[in-house]
Amino acid sequence: LYNQDDYNTNVNSSLIASLPKRKMGVAARLSYDYDHRYMLEVNAGYNGSESFAKGHRWGLFPSISLGWNISEEKFWKPIKPVISNFKVRGSYGLVGNDQIGSDRFAYLAIVNLTESPSYTTGYGGSTTSLSGPTYNRFQNNELTWEVGNKLNVGVDLQLFNSLNITVDGFRELRDNIFQQKNSIPNYLGTASTKIYGNFAKVKNTGFDLALDYGKQLNRNFSIQMKGTFTYAHNEVLKYDEAAGLRPALSQVGKSLNSIWGYVA
């Protein structure tokens, strides 16, 4: 499958905003099912994005999933009236993300030519202010895709042809997360200059439980009940932080968007 997007916003507020947004990608899928017992699916996406510099625009994101319908095996027949369906499955794959902030072409530098004044020199009362160009954002041609490594294992179970139970456990390691660099001291002259890169890493874990009970009591009456439960936890594994930051204020080891404050 080939896909190409060319989206023109017709916005003339700036030169960059007036440029059409473009993406390209190729996707492929291979599925195999043997006797409703053994299932295999392989997917791959090769995607290109305008969000990155030449040499980093394309990313390959494969995935694979396996399933075994145990209840279709011959040895399962004696207990099939009780456990009508029993299937185990698992999947692993990579998922790419090119939505890195609100600015287009974040790898390019932004230079301000009209800053006034830009620089101050001298000491005490003898100072001189001069005008000149300044960087609002430094160039970084190494910006690339955020990548999620996703692992999922699950069980599908049906009891007495009425109660369906689905359990899924998941783990995702999201690497190369887009972030503004905070570890460069202001005295190096970058206090008002933004520097972006793929600096952060986050781990997400959890599980989902779904119950579905249905019963046809007679020709005119049936009952249906459903319920779900989800548990999810995330942890920051890597984050570019200011040098000398107190451990209590560090993002690393804590959940995303943690709240800092006094405990009453």
Model regions and ranges:
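Outer-membrane beta-barrel transmembrane domain signature of Gram-negative proteins
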Residues: L1-E41, E50-A53
